[in-house]
Curated annotation (Swiss-Prot):
Subcellular location: Endoplasmic reticulum-Golgi intermediate compartment membrane
Stated name of the protein: Metallophosphoesterase 1
GO CC annotation: endoplasmic reticulum exit site; endoplasmic reticulum-Golgi intermediate compartment membrane; Golgi apparatus
Cofactor: Mn(2+)
InterPro entries: Calcineurin-like_PHP_ApaH (IPR004843), Metallo-depent_PP-like (IPR029052), MPP_MPPE1 (IPR039541), PGAP5/Cdc1/Ted1 (IPR033308)
Record text on cofactor binding: Binds 2 manganese ions per subunit.
Domain topic, free-text comment: The di-lysine motif (KxKxx) acts as an endoplasmic reticulum retrieval signal.
GO biological process: endoplasmic reticulum to Golgi vesicle-mediated transport; GPI anchor biosynthetic process
Function: Metallophosphoesterase that catalyzes the removal of a side-chain ethanolamine-phosphate (EtNP) from the second mannose of the GPI-anchor protein intermediate. Participates in the glycan remodeling steps of GPI-anchor maturation to allow an efficient transport of GPI-anchor proteins from the endoplasmic reticulum to the Golgi.
Transmembrane helix keyword on record: yes
Length: 381
């Protein structure tokens, strides 16, 4: 009898250890195993200056108080926190850009809900002091154009220390940060202000590139590194659909030929032409669609749409790694663990543990019955 109960105790300890091991693997270890496969792309031309290493992600969609079920919040936010913290530890980027739709309900959240969302964001995306975090605005952060207000925009800009149009220069690399929600072209006050700022930035950047700061028209212009910028915004530039996209994580086939709506799925054709004409960017990075896309505008300007970072929007989220110099850049994509894989590991492990338990219980009953029979025979004797 003692041997039987001793065996049961050993099984219980083994099962607890198995459950803990599976949990640790699925919630911690798997992120290291997957992200370890990622590496920074190398530039083809060596530069005397060390290149800039930048990480780009998009559409985190932190759930709010209205639509966010607690279990959905817990699962998705934990996934993003582990993915981001593991990436920071393994890859150590110098700058991280989040390309909008940080929150899911910023467009209608109250001041109290907004503060709670911001607190959770800062916990999930905490980063080393030597890593710069730059956040762009998306339609879910301040609302679509007809929902956008000065109050919503200002509270976003105050929290993340951004403006709707500016050039950020790091290691001689110019990043043009644009509030694409305000590129509606209807001359609303916010839209008009953003367009005026973009024109000023275009003028100043062209003066810097041409080295004409002492020219009369450029005398009072701001100075930037003499290099074409990397354009960053939430909405993609105008394209008819995702049918022209290439890449391994494009939209599903049944969605690729759905026509995009200007100012809703992509910025307008006119706004796209203005940005390309004013800045002639060497690269465009955007989000919004939740799918990957690589497309070439006017056979000259490459655009990469960065997929969503959250399991809530896709099974295989990812982010983009970029290595930049003033004259060159290289990109690579880093995929995160797939939600389907984690669920399969959990289900398979639970099934195996259940089978082992059932087999042991059957053996336990047989042993108990055998012991009882022996005791009965002993009493008879």
């Amino acid at each position: 009898m003692t041997l039987v109960f001793g065996s049961s105790c050993r099984l219980a300890v083994t099962l607890i250890f198995a459950f803990v091991s599976v949990f640790v693997f699925c919630e911690y270890v798997i992120y290291y195993l997957v992200i370890l496969r990622c590496s920074w792309p190398l530039l083809e031309i060596e530069d005397s200056h060390s290149p800039l290493r930048a990480l780009f992600l998009s559409d985190t969609h932190l759930l709010g108080a209205i639509r966010g079920h607690w279990l959905d919040k817990l699962r998705r936010e934990w996934q993003m926190e582990r993915a981001f913290q593991t990436s920071m530890w393994l890859l150590n980027p110098e700058v991280v850009f989040i390309l909008g739709d940080v929150f899911d309900e910023g467009k209608w959240s109250t001041s109290q809900d907004w503060e709670d969302d911001v607190r959770r964001f800062k916990r999930i995306f905490r980063h080393p002091v030597d890593t710069k975090l730059v956040v762009l605005v998306g339609n879910h952060d301040i609302g679509f154009h007809h929902e956008m207000t000065k109050q919503k925009l200002e509270r976003f800009e105050q929290v993340f220390n951004v403006t709707s149009a500016r050039i950020l220069t790091i290691k001689g690399v110019n990043f043009l940060l644009v509030n694409s929600v305000a590129l509606h072209g209807d001359h609303c006050p916010i839209c008009q202000h953003v367009e005026e700022e973009l024109q000023k930035l275009s003028h100043a950047l062209n003066c810097s590139i041409q080295g004409a700061q002492h020219n009369g028209q450029c005398k009072n212009a701001a100075r930037f590194a003499p290099a074409a910028p990397v354009l960053l915004q939430h909405y993609p530039l105008y394209r008819v659909s995702d049918a022209m996209c290439t890449g391994v994580d494009t939209a599903p086939l049944d969605e690729q030929y759905l026509l995009f709506q200007e100012r809703y799925d992509v910025i307008s054709k006119n706004a796209s032409k203005k940005l390309l004409w004013w800045f002639k960017p060497r690269l465009i990075l955007s989000g919004h669609t939740h799918n990957g896309c690589e497309v070439l505008h006017e056979k000259l300007y490459p655009e990469i749409s960065v997929p969503s970072f959250s399991w809530r929007n896709r099974n295989n989220p990812s982010f983009v790694l970029g290595t930049f110099s003033q004259s060159e850049f290289q990109l690579s994509k880093c995929f995160l663990p797939e939600e389907r894989t984690v669920l399969v590991v959990y289900c398979s492990s639970c099934l195996i543990i259940a089978l082992i338990t059932l087999i042991h219980l059957k053996m336990f009953r047989n042993s108990l019955q055998f012991t009882n029979n022996l005791i009965g025979k002993h009493k008879t004797l």
